[in-house]
Amino acid sequence: MRLEEIVFVSPLGLRYLCLPKYISMKFTEQKLKGVFVIEPQVFGDSRGYFMESYKKELFEKYIGVVDFIQDNESRSSYGVVRGLHFQRGEWSQSKLVRVTQGRVYDVVVDLRRTSPTFGQYVGIELSDENKKQLFVPRGF
């Protein structure tokens, strides 16, 4: 959907952006249970774009209750490889990963020894162009 499709023009010629009450996101669960690729609906025009990167109502519907406790941002120079994000016990937390500039190939590895998918992984390209996000639940 393009922004032009949801712009209201008043009788005086003023333009108002009328965003729908329910902006959708596509949630696709990966082969590792609880890991989701999320594709937000993007409304774009010549001025730029608008999207919701998180909506509690939708996350609870598709993923369950998620209590995000912090928001981090990092910048990596070209060619940098980051290490595994691994936490367990009281330090574990769910993560919502997205890229605001450039692109990364993000990999989630199941390191839970008792899991039926132990040792398996999923990888996805996240970029400022595709706007995809990766949800990684606690324990990974």
Segments (PLM) and residue ranges:
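Acidic, Ala/Val/Gly-enriched low-complexity intrinsically disordered segments
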Residues: 4-9
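Conserved metal-binding segment of the jelly-roll/cupin
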Residues: 126-140
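Non-catalytic, conserved peripheral segments adjacent to functional cores
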Residues: 24-129
